[in-house]
């Protein structure tokens, strides 16, 4: 380690902060703007049904806990990504399946309604070509994905229904085992995929939909990789070498994923042990309704959140740790197999990268690490578009 002499250190400290090189320079920002930047896991649709919440208005993370809106997409140079149809899992029974199906369909309708209401700034896309055309026209793009296939029940024809609605990616499972597969945080009911889950893989391949292995158990991941005729991705996962959690993947499996042409999109959750307490969940539900609170209610909520964070911070993970995770994945898998999937609006964000306005920090850091602009463009979005083309080209075979 190089140690500065006292005179040199004094000189450095005497330079005003404004005169030092900014973390994201004008050249960094220009390079960032030349790339198509996307994230594969945007949970923002949870806000689309909150009364008074406006996707077209800039919100503050400190107020309503949101991390994405159109102004912040502009600020962060986020061209688009996969807006998630998420359904919290309930009963594995006909009544539960029916309720979940209806909730998932309504979430898809909400995504399309919000996009249509902002058509001058964002459009729906189902292919890489459509996304690229939207970017060239000066607009953002919205792909759609399903997190947790529980709403399909035992009716795989619903995959085609969601495909017709524009959905182009789905994962079999979330935080609990379901009718398709074992979860990374489940009990191991099936030892991987169920018989129905194996048919789910075949139907996903037939339709040309990306298979998302995030939240899958190790056995489920192994079987997805073995059975799929097209590359699979992990839309929001990370290396187990950085944080030993079942939601992350070990290096050997990361190498196998890359060898099969797949991708790991780097998560900003599961870098450390986060506070996922019921108390925090309750406060975050109150935050989502920020726009409808009066001044006294807002002061009370802010005080309650500050008190909780003083006792038990949500995360101690910072931007440097996030980049360590990404750089580890690049070293293990290669630059052609890594991308962005930070779990925005679903628990993601780290200290120093609290919302998507901070995305230029990632491409700037990769420039500092010596990556070429072409390789950085792969990580920021190009890899996903390449794999999406491969998956869609393999449809129907």
Outline where the language-model segments fall.
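Bacterial N-terminal signal peptides
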Residues: 5-14
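Distinct, well-ordered alpha-helical segments
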Residues: 51, 155-159, 220-230
């Amino acid at each position: 380690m190089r140690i500065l002499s006292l005179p040199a250190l004094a000189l450095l400290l005497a330079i005003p902060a404004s005169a030092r090189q900014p973390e994201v320079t004008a050249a960094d920002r220009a390079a960032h703007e030349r790339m198509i930047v996307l994230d594969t896991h945007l949970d923002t649709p949870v806000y689309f049904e909150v009364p008074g919440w406006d996707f077209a208005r800039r919100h503050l993370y400190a107020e309503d806990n949101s991390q994405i809106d159109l102004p912040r997409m502009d600020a962060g140079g986020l061209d688009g990504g996969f807006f998630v149809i998420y359904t919290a899992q309930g009963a594995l029974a006909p009544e539960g399946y029916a309720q979940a199906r209806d909730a998932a369909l309504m979430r898809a309708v909400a995504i399309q309604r919000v996009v249509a209401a902002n058509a001058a700034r964002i459009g729906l896309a189902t292919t890489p070509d459509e996304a690229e055309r939207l970017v060239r026209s000066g607009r953002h793009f919205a792909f759609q994905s399903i997190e947790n296939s529980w709403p399909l029940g035992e009716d795989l024809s619903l995959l085609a229904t969601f495909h017709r609605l524009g959905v182009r990616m789905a994962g079999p499972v979330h935080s609990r085992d379901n009718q398709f597969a074992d979860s990374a945080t489940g009990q191991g009911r099936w030892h991987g995929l169920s018989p129905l889950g194996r048919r789910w893989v075949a139907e996903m391949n037939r339709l040309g939909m990306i298979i998302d292995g995030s939240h899958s158990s190790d056995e489920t991941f192994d079987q997805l990789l073995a059975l799929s005729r097209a590359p699979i991705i992990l839309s929001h996962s990370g290396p187990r070498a950085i944080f030993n959690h079942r939601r992350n993947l070990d290096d050997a499996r990361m190498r196998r994923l890359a060898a099969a042409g797949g991708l790991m999109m780097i998560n900003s959750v599961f870098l450390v042990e986060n506070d996922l307490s019921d108390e925090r969940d309750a406060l975050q539900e109150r935050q989502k309704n920020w726009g409808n609170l009066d001044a006294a209610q807002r002061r009370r909520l802010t005080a309650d959140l500050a008190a909780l964070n003083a006792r038990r911070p949500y995360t101690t993970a910072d931007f440097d740790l996030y980049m360590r995770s990404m750089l580890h994945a690049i070293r293990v898998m290669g630059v052609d197999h890594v991308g962005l999937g930070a779990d925005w609006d679903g628990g993601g964000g780290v200290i120093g990268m609290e919302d998507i306005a901070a995305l230029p920090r990632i491409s700037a850091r990769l420039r500092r690490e010596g990556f070429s602009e072409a390789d950085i463009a792969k990580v920021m979005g190009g890899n996903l578009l390449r794999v999406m083309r491969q998956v869609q080209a393999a449809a129907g075979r």
